[in-house]
Design a protein with these regions (language model features):
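Retroelement reverse transcriptase polymerase core
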Residues: 1-193
Length: 193
């Protein structure tokens, strides 16, 4: 499939989903990332064998330099997964915290920073509501000039990002409660157990 085609990611994801159909209990696929997650080492060998068979049957080529086998922690979609924890990758934290203030004075720079902040959204409660004054700066009708409150907010967010808590994976066989809420200003949810 050629690069740059608008629907290419969706078509490729559908192809990968079809290839790995029936393995959802132990294999997660996102575009070209394949994550095998067993309960123990014995299962890991079985699941890897199954994954390799599927790749071979479907002509999928794996890069030996990108393979990580039998590791307890893995980087996946901007997070570090392992030991029943989910942490934001340090390079993303650094990029958010060290984003230059002069770049935040432009609409393009502010949008870019807000986009990177989406990686931290799961770690900071009510982040959307907290950032609403900055989002209004990127709208066609909003006030464009940054004021002292905006800079205080940016410094606060940068501080929060540098001290993020680790998220925890729910224990096996626990009851999970999903609390949701919505209003005119936004919506949100939290998973409790």
């Amino acid at each position: 499939m050629p690069f740059g085609v608008k629907n290419a990611p969706a078509v490729f994801q559908r192809k990968m989903d079809n290839c790995f159909k029936g393995t959802e209990d132990f294999i997660a696929v996102y575009i070209d990332d394949i994550l095998v997650f067993p309960e123990n080492e014995r299962e890991h060998g079985q699941h890897l064998t199954k994954m390799l068979e599927i790749c071979q049957e479907n002509g999928l080529i794996l890069s030996p330099t990108k393979l990580k086998i039998a590791v307890r922690e893995i980087e996946f979609l901007g997070a570090i997964l392992g030991n029943s924890k989910i942490k934001l990758q340090p390079h993303i934290i650094k990029k958010i915290a060290e984003y230059k203030e002069e770049d935040l004075t432009t609409k393009k720079g502010l949008r870019s920073w807000l986009g990177i902040l989406n990686y931290a959204r799961n770690y900071i409660p009510n982040l959307g509501r907290l950032l609403s004054p900055l989002y209004s700066k990127t709208s066609p009708t909003g006030e464009k000039r940054m004021n002292e409150q905006d800079w205080k907010l940016i410094r606060k967010i940068k501080g929060l990002v540098q001290n993020l808590p680790d998220l925890e994976v729910p224990p096996e066989n626990c009851f999970i409660i999903l609390e949701t809420d919505g209003c005119m200003e936004g919506w949100g949810a939290v998973c409790k157990w």
